[in-house]
Amino acid sequence: MEQVVDKSIFFRLKIFVASILGFIQGKLLKIFSICLLPSAIKKVRLIKNYREQNANIAIVVLCEHIGDIISCEPVSTFLKTKFDKTVIWIVNEKYKEVIELFENVDFVLPVSCVSEYFYMSLFLKSFEIHNLHFDKKQCRKYGLVLRNNNKLFHIGNYVKYGSLLQTFSVTGGLPMLDNKPHLMLDEEDRFPEIDYPFCVIHVESNEPTRTMTKEKWIEILSHFPDNRFVEVGLHSELNDASNCCSIYCGKLSLVDSFYLVKKCSLFVGVDSSMAHVANALQKRSLIIMGRYHDYDNYMPFSGFDVNMKIVRSSEQVRDMSIEIIVDELKEIMKN
């Protein structure tokens, strides 16, 4: 009995110490974030110098992630065409090359993290800023919290009200936009070695509930022995499928992967960054979507058209039966 009590006390003490250490670590990270201030001030000066030559400036702030950023491309088009704005887009440096594909963005300003923009915002009060982040966006690196006066949507409810673009545009103080995004890719063929018709397949997701097991995916592909698939993503899941080429996984830049999607005849994948790329490139697509949190009929994509076919389930994607996916894919491949 004493041993059980001792273990219980030890366990509680361990949790208490861990929480204290976590609290201290969080506070220290916020203190250390001050090291970003010189860089932030330098970038504020860049913006102010830029304003001297371009008076009618609007700053769009959306630092991450790929799918969110691509979905919000129409924000820049709206500001440019409606108000003739010179558009500056502040984004995480990892995604700078994505914004460079937005036709109506005049200047891309990369930051290392959300906290760097937090410090920049202290000196940008006189600028027109459209912060597309939901209120209380927390920096993953330093923990600083970005505030937004538009509090209608938040991480817990935004999928209930519309597409990413619809909720993000309102969050940024704009009308509710619902246009299709566009990526400005040229006609260059970056994959001349692929000289046959193929489908791009992307099975990775940030959340395990949004994708299926490797075994299920391989079984789906086994129903199409005469079709060629090329997998994109950071990691290969389908290298055991005889009709799937996975050599590009983890080896392409973001923009190279966009060109691969552009070249394919069909995109197949889950609700993920590459699905938003396919939407922006107006590719024929089969997108597999299931229940997400408490919602089983959400629509993250804007400008929806006949090129995109969505297979839905009231279950999470990981629990879906493959039959409905195989049937839809067969129907699409007939045309």
Task: Annotate the PLM regions.
Residues 1-335:
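Catalytic machinery of carbohydrate-active enzymes
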